[in-house]
Amino acid sequence: MSVNSVGVQLSNASLRYNDREHATLSGLSLSLNAGKWTVLLGRSGSGKTTVLRYLAGLLDDKVEWQGTLATSDELPLTDRIAYMAQQDLLLPWLSVIDNVCLSHRFQNPASDKAQQTNQALELLAAVGLADYANAMPDQLSGGMRQRVALARTLMQDKPVVLMDEPFSALDAVTRHKLQSLACELLRDKTVVLITHDPQEAVRLADNLYVLQGTPASAHSLSVPLTSTPRVLDGECAELQQAILDQLERDYE
């Protein structure tokens, strides 16, 4: 575990939108272990993305939130979070390397640009796109664009990484490869991944929660002790079925 890894504990949290009578989340408790992947599943509307937005400090005054958030080093999460969304969010008028550098330059305007460029080139090489530094986003496939987004996330070098279905729009083989790549490159980061794919959850989770019920609360499921990304075996198949069984309770 790297020295800047940070664990996060969310305790007894509840959330209600001001224009709704009933809460979306209630009694929610999550342990986001330092340097590990925590995976959240749940039906649409169960509050998964809202949890990420809360962690990122992006909730507005339309939401009433109660609960306790504590970090393992007792420091605030402000400025220690990187966010990777389902859409790659690449700016079409910037080259690949400029997209990778963009967030870092906003956050570190005084840093040396030559050093930034060299770091970005190293990250593009790590995601297999060293030859595309000067390409434009519209010249890339969907999988390549998400690899650029992954490089941009790494460029921010934050100890906590929030991922909101970043691989869901990709074909099965590309998704599998990017899962493995992200697992390798984000090792020692504290990662929170939202997914609707039980198989993806089984491959990547060190901790796994299903948001279930109305209002939703978090139900923890035990994961295999094998290292991630996992090779799918019989134990993984059993966990995948357990996830589906838990999710189906919201449709009964």
What do these predicted regions represent?
Residues 150:
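Hydrophobic anchor residue at the start of the ABC signature
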Residues 113-132:
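Conserved ABC ATPase "signature" region
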Residues 155-159:
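A short, proline-enriched helix->beta-strand linker immediately N-terminal to the Walker B motif
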Residues 213-244:
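Conserved beta-strand-loop-alpha-helix hinge in the C-terminal portion
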Residues 56:
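Helix-to-loop junction immediately C-terminal to a conserved catalytic motif
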Residues 94-103:
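Short coil-to-helix segment of the ABC ATPase nucleotide-binding domain corresponding to the Q-loop/switch region
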Residues 136-140, 144:
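Conserved ABC ATPase signature
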